[in-house]
């Protein structure tokens, strides 16, 4: 029926347009009366007609209605439009000149065009009515079904279980209770226990929060409703609250089930915004969600799961016991977790024997589950591009570089001066990093441009770090300043290439003083506080000054002192190892990329493969040291 109505409306509109086009072509305008044949005199005017009639040069004319006169002059036809009020005078002139007068009726349009002005609006209105009725009915409705929930029921297709989720053993243990409740609720009710009504998954983007929710539904074997927080709010008032009610009505019909709300912060931000009042529609939606989760109406058998990476902006009423009373932190995986995740993503991929998953996991600190999936996919794409049958370790190495720093711009032309500048800059980073005790060791350095950088240094930490000591922070700042120091010492000039290094070093130094309490002069203080004043759509967390101008000046002095101290350390290391710098730069300009093994050989003065290396040492170079000075 819907298709029939849709087709009827379409054909009615098509017929109306056809009539409109036809009327355009049969228009009875004066211009269609005037002949445009090649034998017709083009610039024949009404005045010419009168003059030639008076001179007796025209013997016969034909008057077409009261709008035009045609005839023959000098063996050529003319066709002249005339104003209706001039017809009587023209007739008198023609009779006086004894011109033979003929008449023809004015051409008229077909009979049906006269009715067009009445029929066309009616046809268009009927077509519009059919179109609106079709849009109001069925699954494609957007008029009368605004209040319907947009949640998608995911109960068919590939089943996801906890076996598909690597790492997160503690998280899966927490969620296993939810699975047990959905499978066997009587076991809990006999003990008087209540399973949490809501489970909030908190963690950075890409850590697998949605995958965990799907795994819970897959393990329990229950319907799984998924909806985004932004799907609740529309431009019409009351739509969001109506959709929340409809969502829970669907859940009750399919209980036991799981309702998963992704990006909860889109609808669950704290109420009572600042300037101009709150977002009324979003707050009504949130209020309805609070009522449905723990109100007068029981929702037995429905477990609400949600995911967010901004738990700090959520309304406290959402997080209280009885609603989202259990928060499960889904953090970035460690080395073991990255190994497990990568193995899962390599299940259906042909992998060469030289691929070491443990090495890849160690080389990717800070990568999330989504990052590891992207890494495996990029490696597979590179293998296909290189026409290989299996994915090799080389493909993974290049994929890691591409994911971290972007694709190499091998076609970009750099002058010899720029290549030399980048080589000294990256060598400064690498050598300082390898000679400091608490700095991360260099995995690779390159002068091939990537992204917006002219060169790169890849550092490989020995292990995942949850905390950093003061000495580790100082060494990290020293490594960041090593590039600028190398430019200054060996090129006797500095460039804009160190801009990002200086920005990161300054940020770290200021954090040491204002956040970590590592300033000797100011002591163990946190300077600046986070306040919870609300702005539109939630809370804005910003750092406010809670100290005097004198303390602010001391902070600037302390930050400057840390930067100066670390810069002097970097200069000292490079000045004591000038020959090593020159060897590394020479090989870097030749090879463009050096790995950790090659770099260590150059630092020790050993040749690379069969290449001979000038092992001469600068007279000012001291023996290699570990630079443990504080």
UniProtKB/Swiss-Prot annotation:
It comes from the Bacteria. Residues 608-619 have a biased composition (Acidic residues). Its cofactor is Zn(2+). It is found in: Cell inner membrane. Residues 29-111 are periplasmic. Acts as a processive, ATP-dependent zinc metallopeptidase for both cytoplasmic and membrane proteins. Plays a role in the quality control of integral membrane proteins. This is ATP-dependent zinc metalloprotease FtsH. It comes from Halothermothrix orenii (strain H 168 / OCM 544 / DSM 9562). The gene is ftsH.
């Amino acid at each position: 029926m819907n298709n029939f109505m849709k087709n009827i409306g379409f054909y009615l509109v098509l017929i109306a347009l056809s009539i409109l086009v036809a009327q355009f072509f049969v228009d009875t305008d004066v211009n269609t009366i005037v002949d445009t044949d090649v034998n017709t005199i083009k610039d024949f005017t009404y005045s010419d007609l009168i003059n030639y009639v008076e001179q007796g040069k025209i013997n016969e004319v034909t008057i077409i209605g009261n709008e035009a006169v045609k005839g023959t002059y000098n063996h050529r036809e003319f066709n002249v439009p005339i104003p209706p009020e001039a017809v009587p005078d023209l007739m008198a002139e023609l009779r006086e000149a004894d011109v033979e007068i003929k008449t023809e009726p004015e051409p008229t349009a077909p009979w049906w065009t006269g009715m067009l002005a009445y029929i066309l609006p009616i046809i268009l209105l009927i077509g519009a009515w059919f179109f609106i009725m079709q849009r109001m009915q069925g699954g494609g409705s957007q008029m009368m079904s605004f209040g319907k929930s947009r949640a998608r029921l995911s109960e068919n297709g590939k089943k996801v279980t906890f076996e598909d989720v690597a790492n997160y053993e503690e998280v899966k243990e927490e969620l296993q209770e939810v699975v047990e409740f959905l499978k066997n609720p009587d076991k809990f009710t006999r003990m008087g226990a209540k399973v949490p009504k809501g489970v909030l998954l908190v963690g950075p983007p890409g850590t697998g929060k949605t995958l965990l929710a799907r795994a819970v539904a897959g393990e329990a074997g229950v319907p799984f409703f998924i909806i985004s927080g932004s799907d609740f709010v529309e431009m019409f008032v009351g739509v969001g609250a109506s959709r929340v009610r409809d969502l829970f009505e669907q859940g009750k019909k399919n209980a036991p089930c799981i309702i998963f709300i992704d990006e909860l912060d889109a609808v669950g931000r704290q109420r009572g915004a600042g300037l101009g009042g709150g977002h009324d529609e979003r707050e009504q939606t949130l209020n309805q969600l609070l009522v449905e989760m723990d109100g007068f109406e029981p929702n037995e058998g429905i477990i609400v799961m949600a995911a967010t990476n901004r738990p700090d902006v959520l309304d406290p009423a959402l997080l209280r016991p009885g609603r989202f009373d259990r928060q499960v932190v889904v953090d970035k995986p460690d080395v073991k977790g990255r190994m497990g995740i990568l193995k899962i993503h390599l299940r259906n991929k042909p992998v060469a024997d030289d691929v070491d998953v443990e090495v890849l996991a160690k080389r990717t600190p800070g990568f999330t589950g989504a990052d590891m999936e992207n890494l495996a996919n990029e490696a597979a794409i590179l293998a296909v591009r290189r026409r290989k049958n299996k994915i090799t370790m080389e493909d993974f190495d290049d994929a890691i570089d591409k994911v971290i720093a972007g694709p190499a711009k091998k076609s970009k032309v750099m002058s010899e001066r720029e290549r030399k500048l980048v080589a000294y800059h990256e060598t400064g980073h690498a050598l300082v990093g390898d000679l400091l005790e608490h700095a991360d060791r260099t995995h690779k350095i390159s002068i091939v441009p990537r992204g917006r950088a002219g060169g790169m240094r890849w550092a490989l930490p020995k292990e995942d770090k949850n905390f950093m000591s003061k000495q580790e922070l100082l060494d990290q700042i020293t490594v960041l300043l090593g590039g600028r120091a190398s430019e200054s010492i060996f090129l006797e000039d500095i460039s804009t290439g160190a801009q990002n290094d200086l920005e990161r070093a300054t940020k770290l130094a200021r954090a040491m003083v204002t956040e970590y309490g590592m300033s000797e002069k100011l002591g163990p203080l946190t300077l600046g506080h986070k306040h919870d004043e609300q702005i539109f759509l939630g809370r804005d967390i910003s750092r406010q000054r809670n100290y005097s101008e004198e303390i602010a000046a001391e902070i600037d002095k302390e930050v400057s002192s840390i930067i100066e101290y670390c810069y002097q350390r970097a200069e000292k290391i490079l000045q004591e190892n000038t020959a090593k710098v020159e060897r590394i730069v020479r090989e870097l300009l030749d090879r463009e990329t050096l790995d950790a093994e090659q770099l260590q050989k150059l630092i020790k003065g050993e040749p690379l493969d069969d290449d001979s290396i000038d092992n001469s040492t600068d007279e000012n170079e001291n023996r290699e040291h570990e630079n443990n000075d504080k």
